[in-house]
Amino acid sequence: MLLTAATAAGCGGTVDRATTTTARPRPHPTRTVAQAGLRIGVVGPLHVRVPGALSEPGTLRQSAGDALVVVSAESKDLAAVAAAADAHPTSHYAIVGASSRTNRRPNLAGLVLDEGQAALLGGVVAGLVAADEGGQEARVAWVGPEERRLAGAFARGVHTIVPGATVLRAWSRDDPAACKETTLGAVGRGAVVVMAHGGTCAQAALDGVHEQNRIGLQLSDFEFPDVAADSVARDAVAGMYHGGEDLVFDAASGAIGIRRLDPRISPDLALQARTAAQELASGRRPSAASG
């Protein structure tokens, strides 16, 4: 499993390669005696299934005093988790799906999912659909606030499958109404697939594209946050805790892959998409030959 300890900007943000090191050995972990039956608090839509760990879903307040608390960035922002870490210095906290760069604490780690790889894989899926529906003349779109890095990764994935496809970069305000309107505009310009980042903007984009009976994707379709949560829980059971750093989880770790797909995608294309995800996890670039 490949992990990197890195400095990242925002949830799954750009990793500063100059400061990236391999995570084993990881920088300055806290080591204690390994424990069986370790209490691990779980906040948000996460599931921890690790031998020797007793995971207990709850709130930040209810998890106070647990040896390790893993928190989904979907349910609590970094500031709230940092405040809990300050209030309970003997507990360790990990926020899943966000960097801790702006709130470093010795007992707080950020578990960053590699959004660039998720966007690339989304592009591969969009490319497979485009090849099936329109070939070199097909159009697909990235919709939402201007995120050039992620839109670029998406485009690279598309062009891996269909080099001549047109990738529309349909920027909009981070507002559901604006995202839906922009999505409908992209479909009107011929997009057969629309991909968005996440949150209410992505949900509005998916609503819009489905109204037109087209395919919609978002980053979370290609992310497995439970993999990151299980990793730090497994380390905690072994007596090792992380803090003051980010751990980046990519396809090789199992955190990036095909989590779910739009039901409008055919079983044959879904199989090709999963093959492409396996190629990415093994360190190979997904290719048109994956089908």
Q: Predicted regions span which residues?
A:
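Extracellular mucin-like PTS domains
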Residues: 20-30
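Flexible loop/hinge segments that line or gate small-molecule binding clefts
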Residues: 89-112, 222
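Extracellular/periplasmic Venus flytrap/periplasmic-binding protein
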Residues: 55, 148-190
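Bacterial signal peptide processing site
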Residues: 11-15
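Periplasmic-binding protein-like
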Residues: 66-75, 92-96, 189-199, 217-220
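Hinge/cleft segment of the Venus flytrap/periplasmic-binding protein
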Residues: 236-291
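Hydrophobic alpha-helical segments within soluble ligand-binding/sensing domains
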Residues: 111-136, 224-241
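An alpha-beta-alpha
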Residues: 120-162, 169, 245-265
